[in-house]
Curated annotation (Swiss-Prot):
Its main location: cytoplasm. It catalyses: cytidine(1402) in 16S rRNA + S-adenosyl-L-methionine = N(4)-methylcytidine(1402) in 16S rRNA + S-adenosyl-L-homocysteine + H(+). GO terms for molecular function: rRNA (cytosine-N4-)-methyltransferase activity. The keyword Transferase applies. Its EC number is 2.1.1.199. The lineage of its organism: Bacteria, Pseudomonadati, Pseudomonadota, Gammaproteobacteria, Legionellales. This is Ribosomal RNA small subunit methyltransferase H. One of its GO terms (biological process) is rRNA base methylation. One of its GO terms (cellular component) is cytoplasm.
Length: 308
């Protein structure tokens, strides 16, 4: 089992420009790599609030961080960040928010969670095991058109229709209940394999995103972040595929442009009503980090700052 390694750890912490007495949110606790580093930069007066959908992560946080009075974790989605910030009484006073998107290594490496097409396990893929719908429900119950749409929209799978039909044909014989069973069906239906990529990669990603409503949650979270942050507060987001990064990039671009008038209206940049700016360029892992942790290879970090 791979050791959990926080991706772009130093770059994201630097991007948050942590104040010793500041208030911070780690929207994706995982196994606490980023949280631990944030706490290392805080004084006794600093506060860190963490969020995670996964009850295993929440329990880990309580076991390893529970005695730290600066720390508190909420069970739920980062799409509830405004609600949690309100409960904590810190709306509009937060100095930084970190989001490290996607599935965590402990989830991916545990066969029982059903995220991996390389490990035999139940077809589950729920980040939050308290939710009712899992991957098996979707794979065995969705119409062929819905399957194809999800594979195309969330996996950018070229052969979405062909794979969807193969799944529907297979489940007529018996329900599809395991990861390797699904992976084999996808593999056989995929006529052209990408170099250095398992043929089921895109389909598994698509199902995971759909089951966990990952992109919807991301959009909802980003829209709440500016209300949660105080003036000068930083937002740091690490994404792992183009769908996530596109949402983050577009959000930051739109917020930086503010209430932009029609092109024909002459107006200076300084006169635009905006309360957000991008900080620096997108950051990618160094080759040394990729060598040490191959899962970091597609990571992109984007940072922004609330102005007022």
């Amino acid at each position: 089992m791979a050791k959990h390694q926080s991706v772009l750890l130093h770059e994201s912490i630097k991007g948050l420009a942590i104040k010793a007495d500041g208030i911070y949110f780690d929207g994706t606790f995982g196994r606490g790599g980023h949280s631990r580093e944030i706490l290392n930069h805080l004084s006794d007066k600093g506060r860190l609030f963490a969020i995670d959908k996964d009850l295993d992560a929440v329990q880990y946080a309580k076991d390893y961080f529970g005695l730290d009075k600066r720390f508190q974790i909420f069970h739920g989605s980062f799409a509830q960040i405004k609600e949690f910030a309100s409960q904590a009484g810190v709306i509009g006073a937060v100095d930084g928010i970190l989001l490290d998107l996607g599935v965590s290594s402990p989830q991916l490496d545990n066969p029982e969670r059903g995220f991996s097409f390389m490990l035999q396990g139940p077809l589950d893929m729920r980040m939050d095991l308290t939710q009712s719908i899992n991957a098996a429900n979707f794979v065995n119950e969705a119409e062929v058109n819905e399957l194809a749409h999800v594979f195309r929209a969330y996996g950018e799978e070229r052969f979405a229709g062909r794979i969807a039909k193969a799944i529907v044909d297979a489940r007529k014989l018996k329900p599809i209940t395991t990861t390797l069973e699904l992976a084999e069906i996808v593999k056989e239906a995929n006529p052209k394999w990408e170099k250095h990529k398992h043929p089921a990669t895109r389909v598994f990603q698509a199902i995971r995103i759909h089951v966990n409503q990952e992109l919807t949650d991301l959009s909802n979270c980003l829209e709440q972040c500016l209300d949660v942050l105080g003036p000068g507060g930083r937002l740091a987001v690490i994404s792992f595929h183009s769908l996530e990064d596109r949402i983050v990039k577009q959000f930051m671009r739109d917020k930086e442009q503010g209430n932009r008038p029609p092109v024909e209206v002459p107006i200076k940049y300084e006169e635009l009503k905006t309360n957000f700016k991008k900080v620096g360029k997108a950051v990618k892992p160094q080759s040394s980090e990729i060598k040490e942790n191959v899962r970091s290879r597609s990571a992109v970090l984007r940072i922004g700052e609330k102005l007022a």
